[in-house]
Design a protein with these regions (language model features):
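Extended catalytic cores of very large enzyme megasubunits
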Residues: 1-246
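N-terminal low-complexity segments that are often proline-rich with Ser/Thr-Pro
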Residues: 248-250
């Protein structure tokens, strides 16, 4: 392994370079920041001693989210977990399809503001860590099922924000990615993906309808043409993303 690394025949992922061996070589520790490990002797899940004795070596994490605002496992808790991963150089991805769509009823009365309002909060948080993180820019993936009530807004999110950025650039703001135009708009800090089931592809072939389903009671909130929705995905990938393999994956 040493020979392969020294001759550049192979290389570990970024968090390995950032974190592995810092305690062994330089006696770095740092505060315990929520790290856990499986003790090889007991098999028990155990809190880590500090940040670097048992470091964070993995590049990617998949996290779940509950349809809850402030409790553990909910929306705001996810931003804290993402920040912890970003700080030590890892990326994270989450399917947000559990969150209710815009207009769905809340248990305490009123209606939900929808998944997009919370995605924009997470996008801003990632953007801040991208600028001030200790290792590299934040990297995250956002996934939404194709039957989510807010799927159309999700598909067009980056396209609309890109139009805003172009308008600002045309007005004289700098066009570089770190400039004021792109810092002003949202949706710039994640790869967005849609989860496409086989049933949807069959609906495209048959020119059929596609139902958007409420998360609270399973009722149909809206029905769209499958081909129209598919064309929105294609347009967003073709016209407004830097790499269709990275954004709005199908």
């Amino acid at each position: 392994l040493k020979y392969m690394l020294a001759t550049q025949m192979a290389a570990p992922n970024s968090p390995q370079w950032f974190n592995t061996g810092l305690n062994y070589k330089y006696d770095l520790t740092g505060p315990q920041q929520g790290f856990w490990y499986v003790d090889p002797k007991t098999g028990n899940l155990t809190p880590g001693e500090d940040s670097y004795s048992r470091p964070q070596p993995h590049a990617c994490f998949i996290q779940s989210i509950d349809d809850d605002l402030v409790n553990e496992g909910g929306i705001m808790d996810l931003w804290v977990k993402e920040a912890r991963l970003f700080k030590f150089g890892s990326g994270t991805g989450t399917n947000f399809s559990n969150l209710r769509g815009e207009g769905e009823q809340l248990s305490g009365g009123g209606v939900s503001s929808g998944v997009m309002s919370f995605l924009k909060i997470g996008d801003r948080a990632a953007g801040a860590i991208k600028s001030g993180g200790t290792t590299r820019r934040a990297a995250k993936m956002v996934i939404l099922d194709l039957d989510h009530p807010d799927i159309e807004d999700f598909i067009e999110w980056k396209a609309i924000e890109e139009d805003k950025a172009r308008a600002l650039i045309a007005a004289g703001y700098p066009a570089d990615f770190n400039g004021e135009a792109y810092a002003t708009v949202s949706g710039q800090n994640s790869n967005n993906s849609v989860k496409v089931p086989t049933e949807f592809l069959k609906a495209i072939e048959e020119d059929g309808d596609w139902d958007l389903i409420a998360r609270t009671d399973g009722s149909v909130m809206k029905t769209v043409k499958a081909r129209d929705l598919w064309n929105k995905i294609a347009d967003a990938c073709l016209l407004y993303t830097s790499d269709a393999a990275d954004d709005l994956l199908c």
